[in-house]
């Protein structure tokens, strides 16, 4: 087995193994986060802009409890606590959101520029204000290039997100906010995180799709609230615990590599 495959397998096993301890020690925090995450759906339109903050706070409650447990921090009541770690994690999530928004804005400009360049090169006299002109310009060979750029942009966006994935673990471990300074921690581990994430999320996707078909078969296809409850339940009671455990495992191996037999630890 190659080193990369071994790292992926180790990360997946660590994530799955961390589910039961996470539920046992942080169940109250996970439940509180799940309930809080449902509130934005009940907000009136005038204050709908607060939905993102509420969602981040809900995730912070859950992640904070799991990271505190992983790094032997204050436990609270079954993980339920809002302290310095949570404030730092909330700041980290907000900063990561800002970074990702800036990256998306830049990529949006790049995608638009490439699409405009392709359209003008394939259609002399191209009118950028006409939907028909856009459709005609991007229906030929130029459509391949115009379609590859958004795909490459999505890949780049995912890569940036994965490179910042260990920022919360570093923040709790060091006791200070780590965002861009944690970028180097994922050097050489990006593929591991990507593949392990796909493997860990697969059961949730399969279950969600299965429940969706079941709802249609028994005539509950219009019960949107049930679908929301299922998605929130999968997120807070499966994905967040296993993903956090996987990230902690990768973080520990990246910060302090395991020594091979016959060698001294650094």
Per-region residue spans from a language model:
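Interfacial aromatic "cap" segments that immediately flank transmembrane helices
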Residues: 2-35, 80-104, 140-146, 159-208, ...
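Membrane-helix interface segments in multi-pass membrane proteins
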Residues: 33-58, 104-157, 205-237
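Juxtamembrane transition segments at transmembrane-helix termini in multipass membrane proteins
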Residues: 54-76, 123, 163-175, 196-266
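Transmembrane alpha-helical insertion/packing segments
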Residues: 5-61, 67-68, 74, 228, ...
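Alpha-helix capping at helix-to-loop junctions
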Residues: 71-72, 96, 100, 112
């Amino acid at each position: 087995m190659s080193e990369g495959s071994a790292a992926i397998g180790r990360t997946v096993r660590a994530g799955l193994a961390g589910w039961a301890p996470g539920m046992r020690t942080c169940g109250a925090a996970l439940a509180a986060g799940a309930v809080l995450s449902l509130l934005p759906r009940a907000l009136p339109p005038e204050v709908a802009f607060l939905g993102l903050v509420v969602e981040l706070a809900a995730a912070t409650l859950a992640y904070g409890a799991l990271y505190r447990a992983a790094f032997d921090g204050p436990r609270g009541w079954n993980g339920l606590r809002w302290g310095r770690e949570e404030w730092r994690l909330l700041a980290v999530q907000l900063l990561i959101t800002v970074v990702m928004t800036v990256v998306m804005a830049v990529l949006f400009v790049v995608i638009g520029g490439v699409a405009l360049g392709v359209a003008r090169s394939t259609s002399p006299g191209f009118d950028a204000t006409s939907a028909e002109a856009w459709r005609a310009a991007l229906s030929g060979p130029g459509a391949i290039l115009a379609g590859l750029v958004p795909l490459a942009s999505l890949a780049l966006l995912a890569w940036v997100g994965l490179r910042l994935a260990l920022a919360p673990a570093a923040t709790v471990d060091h006791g200070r906010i780590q965002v861009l300074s944690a970028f180097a921690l994922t050097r050489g581990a990006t593929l591991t995180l990507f593949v392990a994430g796909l493997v860990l999320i697969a059961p949730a996707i399969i279950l969600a799709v299965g429940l969706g078909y079941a709802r249609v078969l028994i005539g509950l296809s219009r019960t949107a609230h049930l679908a929301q409850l299922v998605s929130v339940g999968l997120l807070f009671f499966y994905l967040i615990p296993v993903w956090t455990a996987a990230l902690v495992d990768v973080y520990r191996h990246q910060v302090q590599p395991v020594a091979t037999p016959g060698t001294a630890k650094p």
